[in-house]
């Protein structure tokens, strides 16, 4: 079936539209992600910013990311790039990210991420981009985007295959770096 992103999600929101006050306090501060922290398969936690706890409480009351949510970049050169939140970390998000909460009874989050990152979805995003200068995907356009959705058992097979390929790539790179590969 072909379904809209909106029909595949129980929640679609973006982060705060206010530029936050950041803190250097990584102990008491809370992680704050923007589009620069989302790669095509994962969240890059290596260079994130932090916000004070009082601001976190306000933001977290509105958007509360949970494990298996999809974080998708809405603007900038990486617009349309999605990653699965595979952690129970508590964090907040900026307006440059959309949070998509998949209905896991009809779509596997890892399959959903792959479908969003596909060339077909990128073409749909390209045709609905708003803004001169910095590209911007509006939530309304994201919701209307169509995704090919096979039965869940086929999605799960796909995910198992992709994970096995990723493991093979990792082991191959590790062996090469260790000088084991011929």
Question: What are the language-model segments listed below?
Answer:
Residues 75, 90-98, 107-110, 130-156:
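A short glycine-rich beta-alpha junction/loop motif
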Residues 2-43, 58-60:
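Low-complexity, Lys/Gly-biased intrinsically disordered segments
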Residues 1-16, 144, 148-182:
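Non-catalytic DNA-recognition/assembly elements of restriction-modification systems
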Residues 46-56:
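Short, structured beta-strand/loop micro-motifs enriched in basic residues and often containing a Trp
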Residues 11, 38-40, 78, 99, ...:
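Active-site/binding-pocket entry motifs
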Residues 34-35, 55-56, 60-117:
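A short beta-sheet element
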């Amino acid at each position: 079936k072909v379904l809209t992103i909106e029909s595949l999600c129980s929640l679609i929101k973006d982060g705060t539209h206010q530029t936050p006050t950041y803190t250097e306090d990584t102990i008491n501060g809370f992680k704050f992600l923007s589009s620069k922290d989302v790669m095509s398969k994962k969240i890059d936690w290596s260079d994130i910013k932090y916000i004070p706890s009082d601001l976190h409480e306000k933001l977290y009351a509105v958007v509360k990311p949970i494990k298996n949510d999809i974080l998708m970049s809405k603007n900038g050169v990486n617009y349309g790039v999605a990653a699965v939140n595979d952690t129970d970390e508590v964090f907040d998000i900026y307006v440059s990210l959309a949070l998509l909460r998949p209905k896991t009874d009809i779509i596997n989050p890892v399959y959903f991420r792959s479908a969003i990152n596909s060339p077909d979805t990128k073409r749909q995003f390209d045709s609905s981009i708003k803004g001169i200068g910095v590209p911007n995907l509006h939530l309304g356009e994201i919701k209307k985007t169509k995704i090919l959705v096979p039965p869940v058992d086929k999605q799960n097979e796909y995910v198992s295959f992709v994970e096995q390929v990723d493991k093979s790539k990792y082991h191959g790179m590790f062996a090469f770096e260790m000088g084991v590969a011929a």
